[in-house]
Amino acid sequence: MAVSKNIKSNVSTHVTKKATKKTTNNGEESKTVKKAVNNKLLSDEINEILHSSENIKKSIDPESMDYFGDSAKVSKSDENFGEIEDDNRGTRLKGDIPTEFTSGKYSGKKSSRKDNDMEEDDELDQDNEYDIFGGDKQDDDDGDDDNSEDLDDAFDFQDKQDDDDDDDDKEDDDEDDDDDENVVVSSNIDRADMLFKKLQKQEKEEEKQPKLVGHTNEADEMEKAQNTKNQTALYNEFLTTRILLQKTINCANKLPKPKIYKEFLELNDESLQKKFKETKTASCLLISELYNLQSELIDLNDEIPKQQQSKKRIRPDQSLSEIWNTIEEQNQRLDQFHNQTITKWNNRISVTSSINSGGKGGNNLKSLNQSILSQIQNTLNDFERLQKRTKLKRTTYRIIGEKQQQLSSANSIDQNEEEKDEYDDEIFDDTDFYQTLLKDLEANNSEENEVGSQYWIEMRNLKKKKKKKVNQKASKGRILRYEVFPKLENFMTPQSLPIPDWNIDQLYQNLFGGLGNVNINLN
């Protein structure tokens, strides 16, 4: 449209100039000459405009048009922007945007709203002048339509517009960032659109990437953490129970031996026998409850094979051998599960320790790289030595029904001579293992409180480093040093008074309210 308007204005001005020269001639001759000149020069002007690149003004940027009057004017610049590649694949322009593009999506010269209004006013004025001189308006309109169609075909404006629409419809999400950066940006709206598309592309890529922790993995991790917490709580409860049982074990070791057990009961009254029976019954019931609890836990575990036979129970009226046989069958049932569990967790711990040690293989010198089950089996092979360690009498205590031979033997042995270890088959003493548990408990507590203790150590060091407040101006007697004494309370200084000349008789008469005077009179 802008090209057609320019053509129309150029043609009208040229025709009016020629027409004014012919007005001096006769009326009819001037009109015929004017039409001839108009018909001749119109084709020439169109050919000149089509073949001349200087007078052609291409289409303007529609986005740069100020339709609402709220955009700033584009300032012209003499800066050289270099060559701009076709098809919108040139490099991004820096600095001021040029006022005219010869190729690309927005080809043509930029114009403001004010320039368009001025062109329309000039066009109206030229049309009025042309009507005054008798121009044929219908012919001019037809010529303008033809010229506009030719110019549109010449510049392929419609084809480019269709290509742009097709490109917008076929826009893909996997387009490279380099193509986005190379597009010529003519306004802030284009830049905002490009940034928005980049943001959408990044969000889609993030959604396609696999997540490290999904919903299912998160639930599994939470379940593992809860199980670990429960295991730690159970271990602490078992350790507390073992600590409380230590006193019971020491008391059980003081009970009379089977040889003198019957004699001990016969010498005492029936109340002692009744208490012994109650203690035995309570112990059997405790063993039975622990056995039943273990059986229920085994049934809940799917990894342990189910038992087809009827469940056995421990009753207080059973003998000691029958109770031990029932417990041994339960242990054999759990043997396979114990071995698998120990192997699995030992492998996990070994992998973790090797990772923490930097892959140096810290387990290379432990029992010649044997498995954990083989190490346990090698330890249990010497079962007699292990059993003998539990029969060692490590502390001095008196067993009921035995003579006190320890004191006499201790007095006879010299101090330099080493005492021999005393073993007793009727006692159970695992003090060495008990001390190991206590050391582990103390180490764990110290690790937990390490943060707090480290804090107090740092605070103590800071207090040591802290300088005392010293007034440097107090030297050389510049500040008086004095101490305030506390006030005296309920105290008066003595006053010296002259001794009065008292009469002794009068003094005695005044004693006890005048009673001294009565006694004197009686005498």
Curated annotation (Swiss-Prot):
Pfam families, sorted: AATF-Che1, TRAUB
- GO CC annotation: nucleolus
- Which InterPro entries does the protein's record reference? AATF (IPR025160), AATF/Bfr2 (IPR039223), AATF_C (IPR012617)
List the residue ranges of the region (Disordered): 1-36, 51-187, 200-224
Compositional bias (Polar residues): 1-14
Q: Which family does it belong to?
A: Belongs to the AATF family.
Q: What is this protein called?
A: Putative uncharacterized protein DDB_G0270496
